[in-house]
Amino acid sequence: AAPYDELESGLDQIRRFDPSFNEESFKELVQDLFFRIQAGWMNRSIEGIESLLTVEMRDFFKGEFEKMRQQGRLNRLENIAVRKVELAEAWQEAGKDYVTVFFTANLLDYTVDDQTGQVVQGDKLNPVKFQEFWTFCRDAGGGSRWQLSAINQPGESLTRH
């Protein structure tokens, strides 16, 4: 995670254009988006989540869904319990606000064959710890909704660097 002052200065930039920006409300909002996007992922469908994703993420998801369909695979994410929602980075760039959130959750994550229902990957009984960085963006000043613009694993460099 970025040093506190770097994060704080990014949040200050966002607040300069949108004084109503509130960290706690933002965390609640993105946690809601997290659940909605995960549900879309499980359904292998962009329908209903399209407006929550940037064009690049839409294309990425569509590609992943196509691959899963071709392989006859369904990725199941169940009993999702979000443990922590932490702001990791915030900045403005090219007229947009960006905030990266570090999600820590426990969930059942397994993949089944969509013909037989047989588990081909993962474990449907033992929850795993899930940690990912999700970056959300919107027009500076709050003129548009927050959308998911990137997903990174811990250890990967974040998209902007």
Language-model features, listed with the residues they occupy:
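Short beta-strand edge/turn micro-motifs at domain boundaries
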Residues: 1-6, 96-100, 111-161
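Core segments of small alpha/beta cavity-forming domains
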Residues: 2-82, 86
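Conserved NTP-handling cores and scaffolds of large molecular machines
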Residues: 14, 34, 41, 65, ...
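Residues in flexible loops and secondary-structure boundaries
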Residues: 22, 60, 69, 85-95, ...
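Residue-level signal for functionally critical sites in structured catalytic/ligand-binding pockets
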Residues: 38, 61-64, 79, 90, ...
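Surface-exposed, charged secondary-structure patches
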Residues: 73-115
